[in-house]
Amino acid sequence: MPAFLKRLIFQVGDQASERTYTYTSVSNDGHYISLRPLIRPKDDKEREFPVEWAFAGLNTDIRVTKIDEYTVTQDFNFWIDINRYLKVPNIHQGEVHTTWKRWESECLEETGTVYPFGPDKEGVNFMELWQPLDSNRVEDVVAPIGMDNSKDRSVVLKIDDSKYEGLMIVVGKWAQGLMTKKGESSTDGINMIRSVETSTNSYKTLFSQGSNVDKFPSAFENLSKGTKVDVNGFEWEVIESTY
């Protein structure tokens, strides 16, 4: 079922902090996107590109295994990963193996190990704590315990042509998109957007990055799976549509 999660804590080793407004959207079919803009960029480099990380993937790019009633493993092989796109040195390569435990509060504890210096080198452990939000609210509202969101709106659009690849996921009132230009490896080729539906049924942009943010879809009503949507010359395909 769809999910809209806010990260509360990011911990590497003994150091826990949170410098971002990180939201992760998961569609009803299991497609996913995570945008992690910085709250207070601390230097010129961060001010120029105020993003910790962003990635997106299809349901074919993740493997989920149930361990028990409260625990699953999720193995990610991201379709779009801006660290990989930017060729950032010393980053994990390949599948990322994670374990997710649901607490009594319904917060989700994600743990895992990455190997930025190579699979034969010492790994780096991490933990992220996630709070499920009510995606039908425009504010950060904690999802009530036991909330059934199986019928929430879940719409996914994809672009993958000769020049661009990207994913746009709408869960409830919240839309997030990530798109990269093929053949490049600089921040100039990265575009991302986060927006929320207002009382007038339009979408208010809360965060955006890139010169082609006007090429993201901005209307999500009455879309049928398999149809094409033209946005200022960019053709997006609806790959999921649940209302």
Swiss-Prot record:
GO cellular component annotations of the record: endoplasmic reticulum membrane; nucleus
Gene3D superfamilies associated with the record: Protein HRI1, C-terminal domain, Protein HRI1, N-terminal domain
Key words of the record: Cytoplasm, Nucleus
Subcellular location: Cytoplasm; Nucleus
InterPro entries: Hri1 (IPR031818), Hri1_N (IPR038744), Hri1_N_sf (IPR043047)
UniProt-listed Pfam families: HRI1
Biological process (GO), any one: protein targeting to membrane
Similarity field: Belongs to the HRI1 family.
Record protein name field: Protein HRI1
Gene field: HRI1
